[in-house]
Amino acid sequence: MAYTVAAAEGCGRLDRIAVSTDSEEVGRVATACSSGATEVLLRDPGLARDTTSTEDVLLDVLDRLALPDDTAVVTLLPTSPFRGAALITRALDLYLEKGAKSVLSVERKRLKTGVLSPDQRYRPSHPYPAEMHRIEPLLLDNPCIYVTQAGALRRDKLVVVDPCYALEINGIEGLDINDPLDWLMAEAVLAAGLFKS
C-alpha cells in the first residue's frame, strides 16, 4: 500500500487520489503513509466479496466522488509495488497523446501454451519449437496500471475499452504479488537494489 500511495502522490498529475477498501485497518495504513493527498473511501460490505470485480469498486468510487465522464480514472492495484510515479506519468501521457478511452500495461513474454484434455492429453495452442528463444513473444495484460475514461467505464463496465493503447513495462515494474513465490521475488528485487522508487 505504501509503495502505491507514494507512486500516486509522487506522480504530481493526479487531481484526486482515493483508496477504496472495506478494511478500517487498510484505511489507517493508507492514511498513515500518505502526505495528506490521499482520501480513504470505506466500501459497503456488498462490495467486499470474493466475487466483487475491480470495475464494481471503480463504479462505486466514480459515483461517490461524482467524477465527470471525461475524467481519466487511473487504477493502481496495491499488489504491484514496483510501479513508480514515472510509469504513471507515462501511462497518462499515452492516454492523452492518443486520445484513448483506455491504456493498460503489458509485458512481453515467450509462452508455450496449450490445453489438457480429461485423459491428460496435451494439445499445444499452436506449433512451437523446444527452445524458448525461438518462441515469438506475446504481449500479456499486466494489472500494474489501467487508465480508463470514466464515461467509457460507466458505459461498458470494463477497465479496458476501445480504443485501448498498451504501455509496455518491464518484469520488475510488472511484478504482481499474489502468492508466497511472488513475495520471495519481491524481496530479491529489493535486496539486489533493482527497484528505484
Predicted ranges, named:
Residues G27, A150-R154, W183:
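A generic structural signal for short hydrophobic patches within well-formed alpha-helices
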Residues M1-S20:
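N-terminal glycine-rich phosphate-binding loop and ensuing alpha1 helix
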Residues E168, E173-S197:
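Hydrophobic helical membrane-anchoring modules
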Residues T21-E24, R108:
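Residues in the short beta-alpha loop(s) of Rossmann-like NAD(P)-binding domains
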Residues E24-A72, R83-A86, R90:
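Short phosphate-binding loop-to-helix
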Residues D15-I17, A72, K101:
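Residues at the starts of beta-strands that form the adenosine-phosphate
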Residues L76-L77:
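Active-site acidic Asp-centered loop
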